[in-house]
Amino acid sequence: MSDKIRLTTPRRKFLTAAAAVGGLQFTGPFIIKARGETPVKIGFIDPITGSLSALAVSEVEGAKWTVEQMNKKGGILGRPVQLLVEDSANDTGTGVQKAHKLIERDKVDMIMGDVNSGIAYALMGVTSDKKVFHIVPGGHTDPITGKDCKWNTFRTCNTTAMDASAVTSELVKRFGKKWFFITPDYAYGQTLQANFVKKLTELGGVWQGDMLPISSSDFSATLIKAKAYKPDVLLNNMGGSAQINCMKQFVQFGMNKDMALGGALFEIESVRSVPKEAQTGWWTMEWYWDQPDVPEVKQFVDAISPAIGGKKPTARHWMSYVSLHAARLAAEKAKSFDAVKMAEALAGLELPREVSLMPGKVQYRAGDHQLMSDIYVGQVHPPGPGGPDDLFKTESIVTGEAAAGPADATGCKITWPS
C-alpha cells in the first residue's frame, strides 16, 4: 500500500487556508524573519492544503508564534530565527520536492514536518541523506522512531503504538471486545490499526473493519457494514476532514444509539467542526489546554490565545512549540547548529516544564529519539462551562514510557555518522 496521496486543490481553497496561517502573505514559502544578520533558518513543511489542512494550520500558527517569542528573547544562540513554511499539499512527492528546495536552495539549518505520516517518513529519507537535523512534530507512523529510525530525526507526537496502548484497555473495560475499525489507508492508519488489533487480540477481542482513502467523504457503505456487524465499539481512525464527515454520517445514521465510539485521536480541530451529537466518545489527547495542576500550561494558553483568534491552543500548537524549543535547547547545549552535535545533545534531554507543559517527566528518549510525553485519556463532550473549547474531560493520564514500552522493542537501531 502506497504512502503517496495525490490531491488537487482549487486555488481559492488554497488561499483560504493560507490566510488562516496568521494572515501571512504567500509568495512562495511563508517567511517569518527577525531583524538581524546570519539568521538560523528552519524549514517547516506541512499540508496547508488538503484533507489535513486544519491540523497543519494549527501547527504553523504554533510555529509562527513560538518563533516570534524566541526572537523577542534573542533568538537561538544570539541569532534571529527565520521560519520558512512550505505546503506539502498532502502529497509525498511535493513534500520531498519542498524539502530539497529548502535544504539545497534556501540552505536551512533544520527541517520540521509533516502532519501526514507518509510524507514525514519520506522527508526523513531526504534529511538523513543530506545530514540535516529533523524534528517530526506531528506524523505518527511507528517506523519513524522504530525500525527505520535515523540519527538525525526526532519525533514530538506519539507513535500509533503509544496512542493505541493508552486507550485500548479503557475501551474494552467500559464497552466490550467486539470492535469495528474505519481507518485511513496510508502509513498512519496502517500502523495504528495494526497496533489496535494487537492489543485487542491480546485481550481476547474480535474485529472487522474497512481501510479507506485518506480523502474519503462518503462513508455510507462502510457504516452500513459496521451496523450489520453490531460491534461494541466503532473506532473512527480517520483524520481531518475525513474524520469529520464520518462522524457526521455516524450520527445521521443513528448509530450513536447502538454502539460506543472511540479511537486514538479526535483532535480539537475536528471536534469543533462536528455537531454536538457527534462530540462524544473515548479518545486520547496528546496534549490538552486545561491542566490545573500545571501552572505553566495556563501561562502558555494565556500568552498564545490572542495570537490565534482567542481560541484555546490545541495539541498541534503544542507540538510546534515543543519541537522548536527542543531545537533551541539542543543548539544551546551543543553550542552549535551542527546537525550531529544537536542530535547528540537532544538525545536523552529532559524538557523543562515550561517547554513540556505536562505534569510528568518528558524527554526525547536516547534509544529511539521518540518524545516520552504524557497521554491524556478521556471523553469528548459538547462545550462545557469552560467555554467553546471546553470539549474534553481527562479521566486518566498514561505516561509515555508506560505506553511505549522499552526502546529496544521498537526495532530502532540508531547508526551515527563516523
Residue ranges and their predicted role:
Residues 2-5, 9, 14-17, 26-30, ...:
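Extracytosolic ligand-binding ectodomains
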